[in-house]
A protein has these predicted regions:
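Short loop/turn segments immediately following beta-strands, especially the blade-tip
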Residues: 48-57, 104-111, 148-157, 198-206, ...
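Short loop/turn segments immediately following the C-termini of beta-strands
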Residues: 39-41, 51, 97, 140-142, ...
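Residue position within the beta-strands of beta-propeller blades
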Residues: 36, 94, 137, 188, ...
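Aromatic- and glycine-enriched pocket-lining scaffold segments that form the walls
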Residues: 136-151, 158-222
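A short beta-strand motif characteristic of beta-propeller blades
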Residues: 60-74, 113-119, 160-167, 208-214, ...
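Beta-rich, blade/repeat-based domains predominating
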Residues: 29, 66-88, 120-134, 165-185, ...
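An edge-strand/N-cap motif at the start of beta-rich repeat modules
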Residues: 27-51
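Blade-level signature of beta-propeller repeat domains, shared across WD40, Kelch, NHL, RCC1
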Residues: 339-376
Length: 376
């Protein structure tokens, strides 16, 4: 089996030379496609669902990562970004938490071709971020760290020398990683410790030591940079507080410290763990996993957050745990990964930021540990 996997990987890499992986290359897109990672402990896969002309979706294919997931049920990774597209949607990265490596796929018409699989540089990779062919991997296990790689034109990863930086301590629960639009700052949320770490990126790709910022709100879980450079952070809220989740925004100062802009704006729901920002930077949506709904906010010019239409803009099936959300590259659709019911919710994004439910894509097991979602 090992030899077979190696031969398959070699074949995929050879094929990738025909269509090089180059940042800025025109993406070869098919119909609207959304990807979900199975995170299966024996054989991790990426499941592709494609939109038909009538607006319905079908399972296009399942693509092996050649690695292993963590297994478990209902959000075992407790992270955002385990499945990540690059900026121009020509490359997809998958974190194999069980086998400790990263798989690189070339995206061709919605289908995926493996171009590389490399050790993550630590234990239990759970989140991946990309900026200009530099790839950052968050390893949450053991002495949690961020490891940086270069992606070459053939879709292969190469570790950057001395470009591993550690989190504030062991077992802090690293749960998300994001890179600023200018590529100069990497932000990591330590879910258990309640910190937001920032790392300055030097010209040679090396990362500074972590600047540790205590979150202004309880339960920081995921952070995403908006196109204007503001950092948007989802907060689950104080323990045992009903519908106590919130969202905050920050400015990153030159010294790596964070200055709050909007502090703990209520999301009117429970367990807000994930957020997704529209490509134009005007709106952010958060996933209230504990109350099966989606809240929306307008992002002001200074980074202030204001609720859209009474805050709750979308609902998922009763009893579902919406694990993660993603927005399509054109900003027209929002996708919600729904645990406990095994669906992907599809919503159309209106110009004013409100959502219209389109459909629920079936086909995922109701009780399984799938994690990660990304959309073309």
């Amino acid at each position: 089996m090992v030899n077979l996997q190696r031969r398959l990987l070699t074949t995929m890499i050879a094929l990738s030379v025909v269509v090089p992986v180059v940042a800025g290359a025109a993406p070869l897109l098919g119909q609207e496609t959304v990807y979900v990672m199975s995170n299966n402990v024996e054989k991790n896969q990426v499941i592709a669902f494609e939109r038909k002309n009538d607006g319905s979706y079908f399972e296009k294919n399942r693509f092996d990562t050649l690695g292993r997931g963590s297994g478990g049920v209902n959000d075992p990774l407790e992270s955002q970004g385990s499945l990540t597209l690059n900026a121009d949607h020509t490359v997809l990265f998958a974190a194999n938490a069980g086998s400790g490596n990263i798989t690189v796929f070339r995206v061709l018409g919605g289908s995926l071709w493996v171009t590389d699989k490399e050790p993550s540089g630590g234990s239990q990779p759970v989140s991946i971020a990309e900026w200009g062919n530099t790839i950052y991997v968050l390893n949450s296990g053991g002495a949690g760290n961020v490891t940086a790689f270069r992606l070459n034109g053939s879709g292969q990863l190469h570790p950057i020398a001395n470009a591993t930086a550690f989190l504030s301590a062991n077992a802090t629960g690293g749960s998300s990683i994001s890179v600023s639009p200018d590529g100069e700052t990497v932000a990591v949320v330590e879910r258990i410790a309640g910190n937001i770490d920032t790392f300055h990126v030097n010209a040679d790709g090396m990362l500074s030591a972590a600047v540790v910022n205590p979150s202004t709100g309880a339960g920081a879980f995921s952070a995403r940079f908006a196109p204007d450079g503001k950092l948007i952070v989802s907060e689950t809220g104080p323990a045992n507080e009903v519908d106590g989740s919130a969202i905050s925004s920050y400015t990153v100062l030159p010294n790596g410290k964070l200055a709050a802009v909007s502090q703990s704006v209520p999301t009117d729901g429970a367990a807000n763990c994930w957020n997704a920002i529209t490509p134009d930077g005007k709106h952010v949506y958060v996933s209230n996993a504990g109350s099966s709904n989606i809240a929306g906010f307008t992002i002001g010019t200074s980074g202030t957050l204001a609720p859209i239409a009474g805050t709750i803009v979308g609902s998922n099936p009763d009893g579902s745990t919406n694990l993660d959300i993603a927005i399509s590259g054109d900003g027209k659709f929002l996708y919600s990964l729904n645990g406990e019911v095994g669906t992907v919710g599809v919503f159309a994004v209106r110009p004013d930021g409100t959502l219209d439910e389109v459909t629920q894509i079936p086909g995922l097991p109701a009780a399984a540990g799938f994690n990660g979602i990304a959309a073309l």
